[in-house]
């Protein structure tokens, strides 16, 4: 072999080694870039998944709140009408307490009163309890000293009846309380 051929073979081997080194370095760089891109894509996917889950949960909450509000509207739909009818019911009660009514008039007023009370009960309106004073249901308009017959925090007299629609207070009872 000639000197030139030996030199060429040597150069080729060096070129192959350099190419091999470059190729390995280039491959490592490419792999590293791909790994970085993959990491970024995974971070982005995780971020979007979290956003999706938050939005999905928020939508479920909005739907749940909407359903609850609709149920509350249906449950308390007659609240305003009931409040207006209560004053008429009070007037009927006062009219029935008047002396000198004929039996027919009294019977007619009682029938109207009973039909109003029945209609209110059908809608869920109930008279509040008068067993003992409850500041959530009663308004104390007067206090009297407690005695054997009326212990402390008991209701002595009811000036105006109180009513509630389901568990919501429509009107507190005006009462006299023993202290």
UniProtKB/Swiss-Prot annotation:
Signal peptide: none annotated. GO terms for biological process: protein folding. SUPFAM superfamilies: Coiled-coil domain of nucleotide exchange factor GrpE (SSF58014), Head domain of nucleotide exchange factor GrpE (SSF51064). Disulfide bonds: none annotated. Belongs to the GrpE family. Homodimer. This is Protein GrpE. It comes from Lactococcus lactis subsp. cremoris (strain MG1363).
């Amino acid at each position: 072999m000639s000197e030139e051929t030996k030199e060429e073979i040597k150069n080729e081997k060096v070129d192959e080694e350099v190419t091999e080194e470059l190729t390995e370095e280039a491959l490592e760089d490419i792999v590293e870039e791909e790994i970085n891109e993959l990491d970024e894509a995974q971070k982005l996917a995780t971020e979007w998944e979290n956003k999706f889950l938050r939005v999905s949960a928020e939508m479920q909450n909005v739907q749940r709140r909407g359903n609850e509000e609709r149920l509350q509207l249906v449950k308390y739909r007659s609240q305003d009408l009931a409040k207006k009818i209560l004053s008429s019911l009070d007037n009927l009660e006062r009219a029935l307490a008047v002396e000198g009514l004929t039996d027919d008039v009294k019977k007619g007023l009682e029938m109207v009163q009973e039909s109003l009370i029945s209609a209110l009960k059908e809608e869920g309106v109930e008279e509040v309890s008068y067993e003992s004073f409850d500041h959530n249901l009663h308004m104390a308009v007067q206090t009297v000293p407690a005695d054997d017959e009326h212990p402390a925090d008991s209701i002595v007299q009811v000036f105006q009846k109180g009513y509630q629609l389901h568990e919501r207070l429509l009107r507190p009872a005006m009462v006299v309380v023993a202290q």
